[in-house]
Amino acid sequence: MAAMTVHLDIVSAESKIFSGRVVSLQVTGSEGELGIMHGHAPLLSYIKPGMARIVKQDGSEEVFYLSGGILEVQPSTVSVLADVVMRAKDIDEQAALEAKRRAEAHMANAGADFNYDAAMVELAKAMAQLRVVETIKKNIAR
């Protein structure tokens, strides 16, 4: 029997990154981890910066970094809309480490007019990219 699938579109501000049938999607929503499969109840949620993992019809997995965004689940279609989407293999680990270092330095040297929220957002994005890179490294090592 064929696996039950749902159509998934992952779209960034620049282009459509993925479009196809998937068995499952895992993302971090505003209220925690979400696992989306065929038959999931309709849902609209914010997505936190982090990893999106999909399992395709053939059983293969693909991992993406999302800068945050919106998830919409409908009976036959799931849509992920994000400002920035990167395939895990395309993440520059050194650039993410540098962004993390810069955000931490800004926070440590904060003045009276410092925008703490913006620094926390930048730090969260850099940390999320690094978590995606680490996940890929662990999966390759297996």
Curated annotation (Swiss-Prot):
Subcellular location: Cell inner membrane
SUPFAM superfamilies per the UniProt record, alphabetical: Epsilon subunit of F1F0-ATP synthase C-terminal domain, Epsilon subunit of F1F0-ATP synthase N-terminal domain
Gene3D superfamilies, alphabetized: ATP synthase delta/epsilon subunit, C-terminal domain (1.20.5.440), F0F1 ATP synthase delta/epsilon subunit, N-terminal (2.60.15.10)
Disulfide bonds: none
Entries under InterPro entries matching the protein: ATP_F1_dsu/esu_C_sf, ATP_synth_F1_dsu/esu, ATP_synth_F1_dsu/esu_N, ATP_synth_F1_esu_C, ATPsynth_dsu/esu_N
Top-level taxon: Bacteria
GO cellular component: plasma membrane; proton-transporting ATP synthase complex
Single annotated GO MF: proton-transporting ATP synthase activity, rotational mechanism
Major location (coarse): membrane
Membrane-protein topology: Peripheral membrane protein
One Pfam entry name: ATP-synt_DE_N
Entries under CDD domains matching the protein: F1-ATPase_delta
Keyword annotations: ATP synthesis, Cell inner membrane, Cell membrane, CF(1), Hydrogen ion transport, Ion transport, Membrane, Transport
Annotated family: Belongs to the ATPase epsilon chain family.
Primary role: Produces ATP from ADP in the presence of a proton gradient across the membrane.
Quaternary structure, from the entry: F-type ATPases have 2 components, CF(1) - the catalytic core - and CF(0) - the membrane proton channel. CF(1) has five subunits: alpha(3), beta(3), gamma(1), delta(1), epsilon(1). CF(0) has three main subunits: a, b and c.
Protein name: ATP synthase epsilon chain
Organism: Shewanella baltica (strain OS155 / ATCC BAA-1091)
